[in-house]
Amino acid sequence: MSQSPKVGFVSLGCPKALVDSEQIITQLRAEGYEISGTYDGADLVVVNTCGFIDEAVQESLDAIGEALTENGKVIVTGCLGAKSSASGSNLIEEVHPKVLAVTGPHAVGEVMQAVHSHLPKPHDPFTDLVPAAGIKLTPRHYAYLKISEGCNHRCTFCIIPSMRGDLVSRPVAEVMLEAENLFKSGVKELLVISQDTSAYGVDVKYRTGFWNGKPIKTRMTDLVAALGELAAQYGAWVRLHYVYPYPSVDEVIPLMAEGPFKGHVLPYLDVPFQHAHPEVLKRMKRPANAEKVLERVQKWREICPDLTIRSTFIAGFPGETEEQFETLLDFIREAELDRVGCFAYSPVEGATANELDGALPDDVREERRARFMEVAEEVSANRIQRKVGKTLKVLIDEVSAEGGIGRTAADAPEIDGVVYVEPAAKASKRYKVGDFVSVKITGADGHDLWGEV
């Protein structure tokens, strides 16, 4: 029986927080700690929190409380760890004074120091070898690749910069090495994430790095090209998330549409537009020219007809009039966005939007969100129906006796739709998790597809 100390782990929040969790767990395993799947089997528990919106704050506080009740020894990290209460003290320590330690996000060193203080590491840290790709919390065939930390924007509805700081880009060589190790470990899809993927390299003035003797600028377009070249060697996909609509995005579209990276740099953009009316965007401190955005979307699709655009929006922002909301609905219809999410505006403690005039009642905010989603789902359904009859490349995520569940290039894991694939009729057509298969699409609803190999 192993005598290695055991650490339980609870990971909450977005994919960027998940990457932080993976880095902490990788370091724990590298030092010889075991990861426990239960509270009672752990010597202590680490909880990685989210603090972006009120619901996430409460979920994190509840998770900390549960860990304290079930285990008693808890270290807290993540975005909520950087959040203050109304009295100015640390929120977590105020609500849960029995926690052993609290750190902010992206704090692997601080977390490990806290773990060492309360659960000394074993004498032989090399008992278990950690794979070069690190410990992953995602399925083996896809992984998130975080290229930077923090954000230079000051959107009025957001408190991320106050928790994660200004933009800090990872060195190109470091990013490429991680990507290569992930592909070597069997990853078939790499999801590039950050708080602001388009701004990669701004903080270091796009300095030139080197990978395998080749110069690569610390810049989104150059990094995507390098990742596309690497993905092509392994027959894999690269998908871009959190792409702020800078002009530089225009340079990435051709990489998706033609040349050696086509089919590897996926024709998929996750662009958080947030709204379409210039006055609302101005109050949000976001780019404020919807007409130019429409022109760019149309231009992107001229260059890359297969492009899928995902976006998120906020309905019921302070001061939003009915006319301004109708402008947003018109934008959704004209832009024909493929995948859309919408939040009813929710005040976030510490956000400057709380100081704006014109706060709308809860029922108005929720009613506008519902109307928005009704229009967005109609647009999405119309676009997805166009895929019926086509044969598409599908990455298989699950397999059972009933068949398989996979995703096309248009579908990111967990947030987009899926393809339900019929069981293979012939042994030669059987598939397993992580396989790419050609699927003829036979049906669709407003969100998902059905097909056969």
UniProtKB/Swiss-Prot annotation:
[4Fe-4S] cluster 1 binds at residues 14, 50, 79. It is found in: Cytoplasm. It comes from Burkholderia lata (strain ATCC 17760 / DSM 23089 / LMG 22485 / NCIMB 9086 / R18194 / 383). NCBIfam families: 30S ribosomal protein S12 methylthiotransferase RimO (TIGR01125), MiaB/RimO family radical SAM methylthiotransferase (TIGR00089). Its cofactor is [4Fe-4S] cluster. Belongs to the methylthiotransferase family. RimO subfamily. GO terms for biological process: tRNA modification. Its main location: cytoplasm. Residues 137-382 form the Radical SAM core domain. Residues 5-120 form the MTTase N-terminal domain. It catalyses: L-aspartate(89)-[ribosomal protein uS12]-hydrogen + (sulfur carrier)-SH + AH2 + 2 S-adenosyl-L-methionine = 3-methylsulfanyl-L-aspartate(89)-[ribosomal protein uS12]-hydrogen + (sulfur carrier)-H + 5'-deoxyadenosine + L-methionine + A + S-adenosyl-L-homocysteine + 2 H(+). Residues 385-453 form the TRAM domain. GO terms for cellular component: cytosol. Its EC number is 2.8.4.4. This is Ribosomal protein uS12 methylthiotransferase RimO.
